[in-house]
């Protein structure tokens, strides 16, 4: 995990952040040897899952407690291509503790440390039984508060 990061204009400082390395495999690419555009949401998911895990929030345990986090929206900006066998650094971060919406921003850097892709995924705290949006439960907020004040 990298604790420092330069802010882009209009961004708040992240309170949760984690970098994950992903090597582009053959199945991630198209016939031209570049990462297929539809692969990036999977990279985002791997990175945000690892970020939440780093801070002690494990999806499986969240689901066992009756909450799910479906994707409400995803926005992706493609700046440069990534290639087969390239090692990418995928950085996910949150700028605020979520009440209902988890807004997770993601940046992908190539092996030359150039920003090649960035975007945002919005997850909604949802009651697993009813399928309705819910406020993040106290246990989750307490966990997030404790790690945000510790960093």
Indicate where each model-derived feature is located.
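Hot-dog-fold acyl-thioester-processing enzymes
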Residues: 2-73, 127-151
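Generic short beta-strand
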Residues: 26, 106-108, 123
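A structural signal for beta-strand boundary/capping segments at domain termini and interdomain linkers
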Residues: 115-116, 133
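A short, structured loop/turn motif at beta-sheet edges
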Residues: 11-13, 110-114
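Hydrophobic beta-strand-centered segment that forms part of the acyl-chain substrate-binding groove
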Residues: 51-102, 116, 124
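Conserved GNAT-family N-acetyltransferase fold
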Residues: 44, 106, 119
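A generic structural motif
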Residues: 79, 109-111, 126
């Amino acid at each position: 995990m990298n604790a420092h990061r330069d802010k882009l204009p209009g961004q708040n400082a992240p309170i949760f952040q984690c970098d994950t390395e992903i090597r582009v495999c053959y199945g991630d690419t198209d016939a031209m040897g570049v990462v297929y555009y539809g692969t990036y949401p999977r990279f985002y998911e791997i990175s945000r899952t690892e970020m939440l895990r780093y801070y002690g929030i494990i999806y499986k345990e969240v689901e066992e407690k009756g909450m799910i986090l479906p994707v409400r929206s995803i926005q992706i900006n493609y700046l440069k291509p990534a290639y087969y066998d390239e090692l990418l650094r995928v950085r996910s971060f949150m700028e605020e503790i979520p009440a209902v919406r988890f807004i997770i921003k993601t940046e992908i850097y190539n092996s030359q440390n150039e920003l090649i892709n960035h975007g945002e995924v919005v997850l909604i705290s949802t009651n697993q039984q009813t399928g309705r949006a819910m406020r993040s439960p106290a246990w989750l907020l307490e966990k997030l508060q404790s790690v945000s004040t510790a960093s």
